[in-house]
């Protein structure tokens, strides 16, 4: 899944500069704004009416036209600037392109409408001066930040090679298939996911519901439930379907509810000015196609279920008359074609805004699709994608740019960071992933402290964090859980178990852990942060990557299947086949006692013997099915194999 370019070259920490596409966007901005300034001065230069002069001055910057009114009216200028900033936030928050455009042009028109017989003379100078001062202010801030970034890059260079060598060493050893089982602690976390996922399709008890545009959106909670359950399926219980399979299909189907994807109707209208075609898997919207393709592909790979390759199996219904028909093929076709047609290769989530992290999900979707259908889409796209990431989306300290405008090339601060997302990159480029983690782990090691018991924990000082890193992305409230769980997941993926344990200790000490009716969660965190926390509990070295590009060994798809087990009475900690047998580890979820297991994919008419916590035998029927009564008491291990 690596590009040949990355395989031939050593991994280097690169310092970003303004790339050619970004530079061309900036030049275009300058030309357009220069023309706008000429247009702004034209009414004054040609002696037009005060109304036209005031409206013209309003083109220099939002609200500048109010300066032409003089007196108290001029106070509307700073107020407009503040509201314009909110409009820009609405633009990147929900792709609402109309918000800043309407405010800028609308206030210019309003100033013209309010103008009297003559404008206030100093406004002719104050309006362009205010625009120039604003430009110089942001240039100064940018230059100061870039100088600081260059110093930070030098610091990173001092430790990068040594840290990268340690990453290679720690990530080299991965768990063997079939040699592990879910612990009681992990099962408590998995039950948190199952309680959410086993609800009927379209019900959302326990989910965080705030908006459907940014990280707290339902789609991201559903995706990460899918990622976590996919790892359970692939690494712990590949030979169990039952309620685990139902839970995974439920979240896939709930994702197609209009409540989840309907945000695209609004973004299409106020972002693309498209009022007729709201297909969520056509143009842009990698926050759906990339994430969903990755999610569905992972389920198909680990469960061996091909239903979502059928035409129309992943359709999105707008109303009684309109339905957008899709399947795993068309979802990934959309991702591939958008990558190929974008000037940046990386392409937008919301109209106009390109998030490199979201684009990692898109590359991951292609990677799992390649594994499923023996294609080479990733190899075709990845070399250019990585080049553009280095040249257009890397800052001068070597970090990824959080957010860049596709139309203007301007960047905005947003969630990013080596320590939070390297495990996603590991799916499609181990080189990129290890480069990111080599930086993240070393900088995090400076945040390790000793708690009152002398144990190592993670302490993240506020002064060292960006604003977004102090906010729980799943509910937009101040909180530490999301930062801790992101570190835990990355550390587990790359074999940094000491750092992962330090993050887990911090979670347990700071975030209010509770276990209620066998379900574990953290009270001081969003649903999304809790879901990430379960992923971190489950993961071991390479687990995230392998659940997308490797999957279970072929033997599990040939052997017997535990097809029926009641939830929550029976908790399945292991279900693994080496070809014709079935290894099970079960726990009682509602008290010790007798339970019935249902088996599928047995050899018809063959006698099977049961060893372990129970003994006996049974014979498969003509359809390869059978049932078995067992008594669960604590950890209950069974080994089922053909009799001789």
UniProtKB/Swiss-Prot annotation:
Optimum temperature is 35 degrees Celsius. It catalyses: linalool = (2E)-geraniol. The chain crosses the membrane at residues 30-52, 67-89, 91-113, 118-140. GO terms for molecular function: isomerase activity. Its main location: membrane. Optimum pH is around 8.0. One of its GO terms (cellular component) is plasma membrane. Residues 141-644 are cytoplasmic. It is found in: Cell inner membrane. Pfam families: Ldi (PF18566). It is a multi-pass membrane protein. The keyword Cell inner membrane applies. Keywords: Cell inner membrane, Cell membrane, Isomerase, Membrane, Transmembrane, Transmembrane helix. Its EC number is 5.4.4.8. InterPro entries: Ldi (IPR041411). It is an enzyme of class 5 (isomerase). Involved in linalool degradation. Catalyzes the reversible isomerization of linalool to geraniol. Does not show stereospecificity towards linalool isomers and acts equally well on both (R) and (S)-linalool. Cannot use the monoterpenoids citronellol and nerol as substrates. This is Linalool isomerase. The lineage of its organism: Bacteria, Pseudomonadati, Pseudomonadota, Betaproteobacteria, Rhodocyclales. The gene is lis.
């Amino acid at each position: 899944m690596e590009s040949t370019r990355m395989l031939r070259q050593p991994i280097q920490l690169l310092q970003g500069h303004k790339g050619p596409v970004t530079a061309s966007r900036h030049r275009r901005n300058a030309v357009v704004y220069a023309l706008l300034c000429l247009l702004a001065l034209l009414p004054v230069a040609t002696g037009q009416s005060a109304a036209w002069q005031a409206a013209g001055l309003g083109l220099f910057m939002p609200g500048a036209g109010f300066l032409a009114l003089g007196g108290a009216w001029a106070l509307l200028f700073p107020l407009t600037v503040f509201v314009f900033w909110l409009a820009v936030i609405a633009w990147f928050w929900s792709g609402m392109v109309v918000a800043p455009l309407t405010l800028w042009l609308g206030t210019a028109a309003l100033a013209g409408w309010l103008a009297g017989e003559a404008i206030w003379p100093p406004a002719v100078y104050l309006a362009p001066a205010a625009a120039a001062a604003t430009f110089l202010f942001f240039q100064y801030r940018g230059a100061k930040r870039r100088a600081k970034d260059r110093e930070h890059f030098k610091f990173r260079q001092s430790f990068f090679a040594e840290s990268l060598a340690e990453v290679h060493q720690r990530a080299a050893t991965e768990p063997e298939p079939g040699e592990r089982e879910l612990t009681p602690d992990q099962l408590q976390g998995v039950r948190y996911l199952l309680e959410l996922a086993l609800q009927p399709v379209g019900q959302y008890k326990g989910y965080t519901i705030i908006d459907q545009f940014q990280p707290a959106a339902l789609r991201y909670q559903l995706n990460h439930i899918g990622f976590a359950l996919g790892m359970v399926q692939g690494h712990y219980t590949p030979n169990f379907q039952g309620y685990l399979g139902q839970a995974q299909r439920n979240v896939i189907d709930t994702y197609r509810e209009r409540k989840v994807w309907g945000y695209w109707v609004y973004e299409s209208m106020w972002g693309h000015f498209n009022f007729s075609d709201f297909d969520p898997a056509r143009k842009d919207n990698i926050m759906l196609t990339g994430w969903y393709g990755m999610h569905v592909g992972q389920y198909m790979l680990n469960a061996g279920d091909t239903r979502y390759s059928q035409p129309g199996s992943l359709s999105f219904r707008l109303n009684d008359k309109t339905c957008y028909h899709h399947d795993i093929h068309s979802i990934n076709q959309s991702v591939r074609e958008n990558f190929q047609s974008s000037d940046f290769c990386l392409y937008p989530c919301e109209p106009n805004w390109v998030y490199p992290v979201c684009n990692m999900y898109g590359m991951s979707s292609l990677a799992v699709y390649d594994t499923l259908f023996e294609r080479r889409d990733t190899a075709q796209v990845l070399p250019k994608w990585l080049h553009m990431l280095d040249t257009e989306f890397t800052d001068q300290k070597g970090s990824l740019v959080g957010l860049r405008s596709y139309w203007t090339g301007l960047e905005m601060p947003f969630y990013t960071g080596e320590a939070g997302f390297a495990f996603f990159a590991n799916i499609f480029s181990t080189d990129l992933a290890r480069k990111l983690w080599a930086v993240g782990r070393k900088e995090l090691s400076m945040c390790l402290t000793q708690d009152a018991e002398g144990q190592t924990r993670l302490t993240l000082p506020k002064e060292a964090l960006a604003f977004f890193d102090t906010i729980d992305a799943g509910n937009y409230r101040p909180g530490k859980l999301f930062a801790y769980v992101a570190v835990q997941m990355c550390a587990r993926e790359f074999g940094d178990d000491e750092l992962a344990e330090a993050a887990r200790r911090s979670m347990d000490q700071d975030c209010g852990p509770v276990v209620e009716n066998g379900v574990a969660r953290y009270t001081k965190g969003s649903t999304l942060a809790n879901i990430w926390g379960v992923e971190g509990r489950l993961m071991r070295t390479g687990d995230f990557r392998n659940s997308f590009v490797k999957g279970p060994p072929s033997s599990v798809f040939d052997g017997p299947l535990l097809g029926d087990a009641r939830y929550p009475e029976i908790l399945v900690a292991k279900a693994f086949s080496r070809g014709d047998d079935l290894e099970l580890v079960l726990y009682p979820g509602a008290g010790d006692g007798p339970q019935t297991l249902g088996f599928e994919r047995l050899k018809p008419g063959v006698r099977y013997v049961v060893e372990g916590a129970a003994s006996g035998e049974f014979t498969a029927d003509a359809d390869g099915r059978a049932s078995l009564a067992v008594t669960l008491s604590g950890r209950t291990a069974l080994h089922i194999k053909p009799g001789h």
